[in-house]
Swiss-Prot record:
Its EC number is 6.5.1.2. The keyword Metal-binding applies. Transmembrane segments: none annotated. This is DNA ligase. The lineage of its organism: Bacteria, Bacillati, Bacillota, Clostridia, Thermoanaerobacterales.
Length: 664
């Protein structure tokens, strides 16, 4: 390819990647699979590395993380970022309405109401449509320059779809609930301090001096306001939100306009329970005067706008009695104390246990068996013990002592210097083996259907397996003799194990359970090295050349493959016929021309897995039901999409019907 052809191809790839980024992260309507997107991004990065003169600040390649900063420099906002006054109930909202109307005598007032995302406020500046700066709110006048980090958030466009000379836009960076739970699970396994909630996780991720660390975290962002702007003058907040969406920003779909405060109050109260079904945390709603001319007339106090207020949800905390503290063992040997308490209802579910994380956590909070404790759900998803109600102690409470032996195998447990976690040192510990096998068989790894914790425990207790490689040497006859299995279940399990031999390399890499290596990194490693043997032979520098891999992960990968027993397991997998090479995606276009809408919770797939499956088979996924929708797939607790589908006469699929369509 000559230089002109290279330049043209780079521009074509950038345009395609910007388009598909917008479809996936903003519209929630992806048209291609992750694998196809990754292939285009790798081609772009490769071409830009060969021809660095063609790299531009708005290139999708610039999302992967730049140089490590020594510190964050301070930057001034073009216009101040104010905080909001709070309302804690209907009377506060009515008082806000009275103040607004008294300052706008004789005028009609509309309110635009939005969800209040619980994250980190950020400000972005675009010049001629290109992102040039990202900053934290800071003190409202100045903030910290986090440009390299915000570029890693794929919901933030590097280039606007309709460029204007200057735009300062404000929004909230956040971490989805599932991502927060997964991140804390990983940190707990590594003996690292946990984030208290998704807001802290988002803030901590964006304030990393190394952008590669931020890139590894699953962050997103909703935009909701502007500061300085040249080239556009919206008339209302509702119009502004539509315009931001047209520019390529992700804006929250849940927003309404009302002309009286009673309807505003009813709408706010309707979210008290509905919020728990959202994939992200909200801590209230924001009420804004809809007219921007009226906003300007109302102005600001020293701290906050007179035209907006935040309605805050009451904290949901329950008191209960701590019955016991048990210790569980994870796949890396980490001993985690767990609180067992009398049942309480939180965020719409009944809760009976919560992780106490480590010995230091218990000591800091002075938690004792028999205590009355206060419990909440961090990020509405993870139960946590907030505090002990010490004034209710009777003297019968018992202090908890962390065991220095593993509660499962009785092997020695140690706490290494600088770590908060105790670890079982016995590599043959049944608990570690079980968790390792369950991880190996999980959906994101080898996807062996029917091999969960109970079956893994049966296989280990019977002595049929001692590691995950042994799975490939099982017979249906052996498995059928296990309690509660039977011939049919045994045959299904063996068939699932046999089928997993043909998985692509990224699933195997993730299934090996290498510390710090998640699904995305496993895919990137597989695509880069193509063969497991090449990854094993690679040096740390070559591994670190992959955008999603940092120094700690590279060291962890090398340490894993330096262990003789791990290499022996890999040889055993090869001998059994397990694929160790990257398989290029084979196109099966059975769903070509079909558009699917998903509603409710699916039991066999996560939402993303179902979407990727549809895309990989040539179909499309939409976030809303219309006459163009081919099928609506319905899980548990479906929403209004099911009602709309029935009204339009759109075919409805149960989860089982969907499975048969895509898996047969």
């Amino acid at each position: 390819m000559d230089k002109e052809a290279v330049k043209k191809r780079i521009e074509e790839l950038r345009a395609l990647l910007h388009y598909h980024n917008y479809r996936y992260y903003v519209l929630d309507q992806p048209e291609i699979s992750d694998a196809e997107y990754d292939r285009m991004l790798r081609e772009l990065i490769s071409l830009e590395q060969q021809y660095p003169e063609f790299i531009t600040p708005d290139s999708p390649s610039q999302r992967v993380g730049g140089e490590v900063a020594k510190e964050f420099r301070e930057v001034a906002h073009l216009k101040p970022m104010y905080s909001l006054d709070n309302a804690f109930g209907p009377e506060d909202l009515k008082e806000f309405d009275r103040r607004v109307r008294s300052l706008l005598p004789g005028q009609e007032v509309e309110y635009e109401v939005e969800l209040k995302i619980d994250g980190l406020a950020i400000s972005l500046v675009y010049e001629n449509g290109v992102l040039v700066r990202g900053a934290t709110r800071g003190n409202g006048t100045t903030g910290e320059d986090i440009t390299a980090n915000v570029k890693t958030i794929k919901a933030i466009p590097l280039k606007l779809r309709n460029p204007i000379p200057l735009l300062e836009v404000r929004g909230e960076a956040y971490m989805p609930k599932e991502s927060f739970a997964r991140l804390n699970e990983q940190r707990e396994e590594r003996g690292e301090p946990l984030f208290a909630n998704p807001r802290n996780a988002a803030a901590g991720s964006l304030r990393q001096l190394d952008p590669k660390v931020t890139a590894e975290r699953d962050l997103s962002a909703f935009m909701y306001a502007i500061g300085e702007v040249q080239g556009y003058e919206p008339k209302t907040q509702a119009e502004l939100m539509e315009w931001l969406s047209e520019l390529g920003f992700k804006v929250n779909p849940y927003r309404e306009v009302f002309n009286n405060i009673d309807d505003v109050i009813n709408y706010c109260q309707s979210w008290h329970e509905k919020r728990f079904s959202l994939p992200y945390v909200i801590d209230g709603l924001v009420i804004k005067v809809n007219s921007l001319a009226q906003q300007e007339a109302l102005g600001f106090t020293a701290k906050s706008p007179r035209w907006a207020i935040a309605y805050k949800f009451p904290a949901e905390i329950a008191e209960t009695r701590l019955k016991d503290i048990i210790v569980r063992v994870g796949r890396t040997g980490v001993l985690t104390p767990t609180a067992i308490f009398e049942p309480v209802s939180l965020a719409g579910t009944t809760v009976t246990r919560a992780s106490l994380h480590n010995e230091d956590y218990i000591r800091e909070k002075d938690i004792r068996i028999g205590d009355i404790i206060r419990v909440q759900k961090a990020g509405e998803i993870i139960p946590e013990v907030v505090e002990v109600v010490k004034e209710k102690r009777t003297g019968a409470e018992k202090e908890f002592v962390m065991p220095d032996t593993c509660p499962v195998c009785q092997g020695k447990a140690v706490r290494l210097p600088g770590e908060a976690a105790w670890r079982c040192t016995n590599a043959s510990c049944p608990a570690q083996l079980k968790e390792g096998i369950v991880h190996f068989a999980s959906r994101g790894a080898m996807n062996i259907e029917g091999l969960g914790p109970a079956v893994a425990e049966l296989l280990l207790e019977a002595g049929l397996i001692h590691n995950y490689a042994d799975l490939y040497y099982l017979s249906a006859e052996e498995v059928a003799r296990l309690p509660r299995m039977g011939k049919k279940s045994a045959e299904n399990l063996i068939n699932a194990i046999e089928k997993s031999k043909q998985n692509s390399l990224e699933r195997l890499i993730y299934g090996l359970g290498i510390r710090l290596v998640g699904e995305k990194a496993a895919r990137d490693l597989a695509v880069h090295f193509k063969e497991l043997d090449k990854l094993i032979a690679a040096g740390e520098e070559e591994i670190m050349a992959i955008p999603s891999v940092g120094p700690k992960m590279a060291a962890s990968i090398k340490a894993f493959f330096a262990q003789k027993e791990n290499l022996e397991l890999i040889e055993k997998l090869k001998a059994a016929g397990v694929n160790t090479k990257y398989l290029a995606e084979v196109r099966d276009n059975r769903l070509e021309g079909l558009t699917f809408v998903l509603t409710g919770t699916l039991s066999s797939f996560t939402r993303k897995e179902a979407e990727q499956l549809i895309l990989s088979l040539g179909g499309k996924v939409s976030s809303s039901v219309s006459k163009k929708t081919s099928y609506v797939v319905v899980g548990e607790d479906p929403g209004s999409k099911l009602t709309k589908a029935k009204e339009l006469g759109i075919p409805i699929l149960t989860e089982e019907e969907f499975r048969q369509m895509v898996m047969s």
